[in-house]
């Protein structure tokens, strides 16, 4: 983990410098040159313990009743006693071509060009819910306290600012999550993508999601 942390620390150094600033200022001052963050969820390693969900809620102060991250369990696969479950991560895909960004009338939903992270500026959000309707992955919600759109931001305002990995990655006991710079061929995530077969959910939509998945069974691709 130390090696992978070092791979992306250069990309989050600026984030630490702007800790505590308002969302609008953060969006304008980020300068993470050459970084395009992505994540891999290895379904063959995920055990559905939901430690990632708990860590996300705690670190990002997500109220009960809503969630930035959900682990969905499939129907039983196989026959007793060899029954297995597939666990599917439902969260923001941080699309390069994000429909939520395209429909936002105020510019509150944006894709940070320097890091690739899709985020929401709460100072600009008017709660119109256009982005929620446009997202084909159904991962956005209205925050019950701020009344603005919310979702996974790869812990951009919390762990990344502190030079840490996203909370879900740090909490996973089976190392089913890998996070890093997709544009760095030597990063842990780039090496993993070369080594294992992966798929991306609803890729045919042309959104270019940056959440990759190692399938539950090799050769099995879910759409």
UniProtKB/Swiss-Prot annotation:
InterPro entries per UniProt: 4Fe4S_Fe-S-bd (IPR017896), 4Fe4S_Fe_S_CS (IPR017900), Cyt_c_NO2Rdtase_NrfC (IPR017567), ET_IronSulfur_Cluster-Binding (IPR050954), TAT_signal (IPR006311), TAT_signal_bac_arc (IPR019546)
Gene Ontology molecular function, alphabetical: 4 iron, 4 sulfur cluster binding; metal ion binding; nitrite reductase (cytochrome, ammonia-forming) activity
PTM description: Exported by the Tat system. The position of the signal peptide cleavage has not been experimentally proven.
Domain 4Fe-4S ferredoxin-type intervals: 37-65, 83-114, 116-145
Binding site for [4Fe-4S] cluster 2: 56, 152, 155, 168
Keywords (A to Z) from UniProt: 4Fe-4S, Electron transport, Iron, Iron-sulfur, Metal-binding, Oxidoreductase, Repeat, Signal, Transport
Protein task: Probably involved in the transfer of electrons from the quinone pool to the type-c cytochromes.
Protein name: Protein NrfC
Organism: Escherichia coli (strain K12)
Organism lineage string: Bacteria, Pseudomonadati, Pseudomonadota, Gammaproteobacteria, Enterobacterales
């Amino acid at each position: 983990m130390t090696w992978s942390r070092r791979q992306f620390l250069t990309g989050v150094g600026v984030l630490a410098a702007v800790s505590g600033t308002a969302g609008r200022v953060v969006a304008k001052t980020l300068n993470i040159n050459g970084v395009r963050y992505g994540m891999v969820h290895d379904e063959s390693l995920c055990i559905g313990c939901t430690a990632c969900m708990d860590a996300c809620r705690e670190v990002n102060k997500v109220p009960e009743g809503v969630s930035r991250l959900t682990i969905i369990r499939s129907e039983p696969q196989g026959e007793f006693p060899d029954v297995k479950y597939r666990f599917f991560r439902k969260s923001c895909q941080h699309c390069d071509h994000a429909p939520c960004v395209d429909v936002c009338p105020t510019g509150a939903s944006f894709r940070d060009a320097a890091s690739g992270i899709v985020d929401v500026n709460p100072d600009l959000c008017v709660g119109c819910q256009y982005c929620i309707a446009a997202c084909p992955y159904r991962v956005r919600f209205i925050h019950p306290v701020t009344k603005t759109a919310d979702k996974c931001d790869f812990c951009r305002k919390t762990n990344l600012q502190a030079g840490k990995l996203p909370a879900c990655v740090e909490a996973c006991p089976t190392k089913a999550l890998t996070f890093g710079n997709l544009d760095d061929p030597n990063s842990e995530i780039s090496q993993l993508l070369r080594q294992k077969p992966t798929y991306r959910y609803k890729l045919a939509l042309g959104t270019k999601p940056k959440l990759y998945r190692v399938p539950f069974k090799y050769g099995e691709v879910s759409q």
